[in-house]
Amino acid sequence: SSAASDVYKRQIDDERFAHAYAHDKLTYDKWGRRKIEQGLYQKGVSKDIYGKVLDEISDERYIEVLKPLLSKKWKTIKGRNDYECAMKLMKYALGRGFELSVIRKCIDDMEIPTDD
């Protein structure tokens, strides 16, 4: 087998791995694009492969994962007021690798109970 076909085979393997990794981390571990990107980088997957894989994650699917995660976390967050709780929620989601713009959109869409 030639060196060129070995390189091609490795790229196909890396692509398949990157797809499976991204799918599993988003679905089961509730990771955002940034954290998935970091993981793929650490595993030695090339930027053009993981860039393409991350671009294929639809925003709908992404929000579908993030909203329930934020709703569940909201119930356990303690803070002096809703603003402080929302900031903690944002920090939590950023730590899981989600982007600020998506987090903000999800928080804005959430029915956040106020302490009346």
Language-model features: where?
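An alpha-helical, amphipathic repeat domain used for nucleic-acid recognition
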Residues: 5, 9-116
